[in-house]
Structures are given as C-alpha cells and as structure tokens.
Amino acid sequence: MSGNTLGLLFTVTTFGESHGPAIGAVVDGCPPGMSLTEADIQIDLDRRKPGTSRHVTQRQEADQVEILSGVFEGKTTGTPICLLIRNTDQRSKDYGNIVETFRPGHADYTYWHKYGIRDYRGGGRSSARLTAPVVAAAAIAKKWLNEQYGTEIRGYMSQLGEVEVPFTDWKHVPENPFFAANADIVPELETYMDALRRDGDSVGARIEVVASHVPVGLGEPLFDKLDADIAHAMMGINAVKGVEIGAGFDSVSQRGTVHGDELTPEGFRTNNSGGVLGGISTGQDIKVSLAIKPTSSIRTARESIDKAGSPASVETFGRHDPCVGIRATPIAEAMLALVLMDHALRHRAQCGDVRVDTPRIPAQAPGKS
C-alpha cells in the first residue's frame, strides 16, 4: 500500500488500523518557530470524534492526541511532527460474521483482491477511523495559514439524505451534532435519523466547505492546479463520491454572461469559480461541495458472496455511523487546509518574490455575492 502520503512540501503520512493499538500521522515540512501544543490540535479532534450524539457511532474514543516529535519548548522545530492517537474502545468480536464474506458497497472485496489479505476488524485501514489523524495534522496547517494570512476554513452540512438544510448563519454550526447552519431544522434531522436507525439503514449527505482570506496565487498549473489537488484530496475521504468547486455541475446550464465572475475595482461581482481560475486561487472564498454515500455497514441483510464465490447474506453488527456525513464536516475542512498549506509553501518557494503593479481587488464587491 503506497498511497498513504498527501502533499509535496507539507506532507502528511498516516498510519494504523481501526482496531490496532493506535493510529497517527507524521507531518513533515511544517515551518519552524510556530507555537504548537496538543490543545491546539485537540479542538478539531473533539469536533470529529465518535460517540458525541445518538446519531453517530457509539464507539467511545477519547481521541487524545500525543505529540511525539517535532515540537520543542512549545514551538515547531521544522523536523517531522509525529502525532499519535491510541485506540481504546475496539470491539472486534462484532465483525466475526464478515471474516469470510464481503459487505456490499465496502472496500472488503477490493482490498481482498488487491492485497490477498484484509483486516476485517472495523475495516482495518479502509475505516473512516483513519480520518482522525488527518484532522489532527490539518489542525497544524489551519493554525499556520491563519497566522500567516488570516485564512479561515469552515464547513457545514447542506443536505442529509432527502432533507435539504438551508444555510442561515454560521453561528448555528457548532450548536448541533449535524454541523447544520440552521437551528430550526435540527428537530427534523433528529427525527429523520431516529427513523433511519430503527430501519437498520443508512443515508448519505452533502457537505459544504469554505476557505476565506486565501492569498492570490496558490496552485501549480498544469497538473497540480489548486482545484485539481483539492478534488484529489477530497476524494481521499472515506465515502466521498463527488466533488464540486464553485458552481460545479450547475456550470453546465449557466451561460457565459452569468458564469464568468466580473471584476471591478471594488471587487469580484460573483464567485461561480469557487475561488480558483486557471488552477490558481483568486483571493475569493474557495468553495467546495462534497457528496457522501450512505454507510456500507448496516444491520439490514444484503446479498453478497463469500471467499469461495458462493452466495451469502451479510448483516453487520458493529457500531457504525448511519450517516458518515454527520461527522464529515471537520474532515472536509481538514483536507482543504492540508492542500492550501502545501500550496502556500510551494507558492512561497517559487513565486514569493513576484510583484506586479496591478492591485489585488477585494474578494467580493459591496452588495454582491
């Protein structure tokens, strides 16, 4: 397995399995001299961790991060930062019935055929549990980006199954377990999820992520365009099946007179580009939407096969999220932060001394969106 590292100058390599003794990440390329403590990282981990409501997996993991290297006297040293999160609530016996079978929609079948061996306990390496070290590593990137540029990365759920969640205000996002930017719809979402759990089924979700105060110039055309790397990273999140940037697939029905974001001395009139033109950041908000599929591990019996190729019925009894999208918001924020951090360092290395006479216009003209 060779696809465990993300980034070029700011790299993150994750390790571990869902039911192993620990999971973690090695972060390399972080500039020296930045103040960093475990508490800085723990904030985002607590937003992602399991067992925080009845609507997510009831696996109880504290997800307490340990910094093993790369920080001395409270500051980054420029050397690799090793982050460790110990697994404490594994229950491997729940997976005894899938040792010889494959869950429909899960990585069981493909991992078996590719590697000839698979850790069936909680999905092993393919588990969404491995997003915890990603979130931990990204907390470092978020901190550096904010200190350098004032960059802020926020996300919210805009759809849960068939239920659309209209955006009303960012302040509501931390107030509910769905990361919904709408307080009024939370009771409906809770009723929806309670019914789904009783049915032994699962559902997908749509997540929106926005990065504000991003500097102009991030991205490396042609093949390391900023939006290309964002899409690549987002597709690395478990259960993500679609990525849109800016207007996304709505661009198909837009005319050029609408889609092209007009520039004025006061700022951009619109942001259909999602903050990226020609693979390079414009300084506008970077807007990303994710489509997340329903959880594969469900209590309803499904048709499958066993290792011999014979018909089998599969029902999963482990503790699972009926909608992995509920906890996906901080994970999506994390992936965007990692890509922006890597590209910020790459831009600084090659083009940090580039100067042009044209002024940088505001991200948004007054009265426009």
Curated annotation (Swiss-Prot):
Keyword Nucleotide-binding attached: no
Keyword field contains Lyase: yes
Cofactor binding summary note: Reduced FMN (FMNH(2)).
Catalytic activity entry: 5-O-(1-carboxyvinyl)-3-phosphoshikimate = chorismate + phosphate
Positions of NADP(+) binding: R48, R54
Binding site for FMN: R125, S126, S127, N238, A239, G278, K293, P294, T295, S296, S297, R319
EC number from the UniProt entry: 4.2.3.5
Biological process terms in GO annotation: amino acid biosynthetic process; aromatic amino acid family biosynthetic process; chorismate biosynthetic process
Subunit structure: Homotetramer.
HAMAP family in the record: Chorismate_synth (MF_00300)
Function: This reaction introduces a second double bond into the aromatic ring system.
Name by which UniProt lists this protein: Chorismate synthase
Organism: Cupriavidus metallidurans (strain ATCC 43123 / DSM 2839 / NBRC 102507 / CH34) (Ralstonia metallidurans)
Gene: aroC
